[in-house]
Amino acid sequence: ARNIEKLKDLKKEIKAHLIKCDVTNIKSVTNLFKKTDKIVGAPNLVIYNPSKSLGGNIIDLDPKKAYEAINITCYGGFLVAQQAAKRMLKKKRGSIFFTGATASVKGFPKSSVFAMGKFGLRGLAQSLARELHPQNIHIGHFIIDGGIGRENYGSYKTIHPDSIAKIYLEFHYQDKSAWSWETELRTSVEKF
């Protein structure tokens, strides 16, 4: 995260290490992995979650903000995957997962920038799956089709974060004879 202050409670809860990182900066991403190497070694699983949404009419969008949003949503995924793959290829195993959205497969009005970033991230994941699966690196892309939250859990209006985490782990442990590269997650009441 760029701002690790908001994660301090989570750090205590799950006994995690916090490392500040700007995913759009090559040096920052390289430093993240070098620090991780020293703390816990080469990762077995890397999940890329960052994204930035920018909505609005195409004629009103600020090009600089659009550039930043696409860099965070997509280019950062490339930088993180590159560093993760370098380490995993040496170990001859690992998983790299990307968190997508409905916008990964369907553009909506006034969401062109978000769709560009998520479409690009999905394309990256699909290409990497074809490149790295034969080398025992599992690539996954997860289309999160709905809001995420703990509230309204019984009504299934949002996807519970613990349920998402469970699916990610199940995907990580898929048998090599039945690997998939993409899955969609939505509540039972979400229209699609």
Residue ranges and their predicted role:
Residues 14, 35-48, 54:
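A glycine-rich helix->loop->beta "capping" turn
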Residues 42-43, 57, 88-101, 134-137:
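Active-site loop of short-chain dehydrogenase/reductase
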Residues 51-57, 105-108:
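Helix N-cap/beta-alpha junction loops of NAD(P)-dependent oxidoreductase domains
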Residues 95-120, 126, 130-133, 143, ...:
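Catalytic loop of short-chain dehydrogenase/reductase
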Residues 134-192:
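C-terminal helical subdomain
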